[in-house]
């Protein structure tokens, strides 16, 4: 499994883990949180490695289905990107003021409008 997949699964788990069954949560915690192998988890629950694999697959599928229906992770990621964009724009305006560079009122207004547009988009 690629690192991006692990990160995405962990993020999905953070948002939707409480919606999983107890067994799915336990298996996910041991595999992703404690970094145990399939064999170690199988021994812990007295099931086969295939059983652990299936539990992980089913849990992953459930997490992705929750995301498709609810979209909370996507909204969270969009919000983080928007906040970063707003921060950069405000930082740029502050630097211009500190350098005492004269910005035309139209430039300041345009930049503030871009920031407002980003905020409005977040509220949708």
Q: Which positions does each model-derived feature cover?
A:
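Short amphipathic alpha helix immediately N-terminal
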Residues: 22-33
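Short alpha-helical "recognition helix" segments of helix-turn-helix
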Residues: 40-42
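Helix-turn-helix DNA-binding motif, specifically the short coil turn and the N-cap/start of the second
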Residues: 48
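Helix-turn-helix/homeodomain-like alpha-helical modules used for DNA recognition
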Residues: 81-124
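Short amphipathic alpha-helical boundary/capping segments
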Residues: 11-20
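Mid-chain, well-packed structural core segment of small domains
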Residues: 59-92
């Amino acid at each position: 499994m690629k690192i991006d997949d692990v990160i995405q699964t962990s993020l999905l788990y953070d948002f939707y883990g409480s919606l999983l069954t107890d067994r799915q949560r336990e298996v996910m915690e041991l595999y992703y949180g404690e970094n145990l192998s399939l064999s170690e988890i199988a021994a812990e629950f007295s099931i086969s490695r295939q059983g652990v694999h299936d539990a992980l697959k089913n849990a992953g599928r459930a997490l992705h289905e929750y995301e498709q229906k609810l979209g909370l992770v996507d909204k969270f990621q969009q919000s983080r990107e928007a906040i970063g964009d707003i921060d950069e724009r405000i930082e740029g305006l502050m630097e211009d003021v500190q350098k005492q560079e004269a910005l035309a009122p139209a430039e300041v207004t345009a930049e503030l409008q871009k920031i407002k547009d980003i905020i409005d988009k977040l509220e949708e």
